[in-house]
């Protein structure tokens, strides 16, 4: 994912977001990295690698991940979520879309928060950002 925080968000809050994202990426069950987006159009980026789609779905619905979304999304202006798979079976792509859709269906408050973003792109983009 890549994102940019709203310019009016105080530096102390940005620092807390960075600390939380860094801690989350270091304690998850995936190989992950969080940091500044170098050379891109965003401030921050994170990449995670999972051995299975089940692990990925569990992370997406983990209470700590959901709490970070609920705290962070109101502070973000632009967000891009992307999924990369090394399996070229179209069914895998469909399953990833379904993982996101199940998450949005189970947590409609996230859709409301995503609707407040100026820009959102990603798998199964919900609400006003749906394509």
List each language-model region with its residue ranges.
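Short, flexible helix/strand-to-coil boundary loops that buttress conserved ligand/catalytic motifs
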Residues: 60, 69-72
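Short S/T/G/P-rich N-terminal loop/turn motif that feeds into the first structured element of a domain
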Residues: 1-44, 51-58, 77-131
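Short arginine-rich
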Residues: 67-70, 78-79
């Amino acid at each position: 994912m890549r994102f940019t925080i709203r310019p009016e968000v105080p530096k102390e809050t940005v620092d807390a977001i960075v600390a939380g994202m860094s801690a989350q990426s270091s304690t998850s069950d995936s190989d992950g990295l969080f940091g500044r987006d170098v050379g891109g159009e965003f401030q921050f980026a994170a990449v995670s690698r999972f051995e299975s789609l089940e692990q990925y779905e569990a992370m997406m619905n983990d209470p700590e991940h959901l709490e970070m979304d609920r705290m962070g999304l109101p502070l973000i202006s632009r967000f891009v979520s992307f999924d990369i798979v090394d399996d070229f079976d179209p069914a895998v792509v469909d399953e990833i879309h379904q993982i996101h859709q199940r998450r949005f269906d189970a947590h409609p408050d996230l859709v409301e928060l995503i609707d407040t973003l100026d820009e959102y792109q990603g798998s199964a983009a919900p609400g006003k950002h749906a394509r």
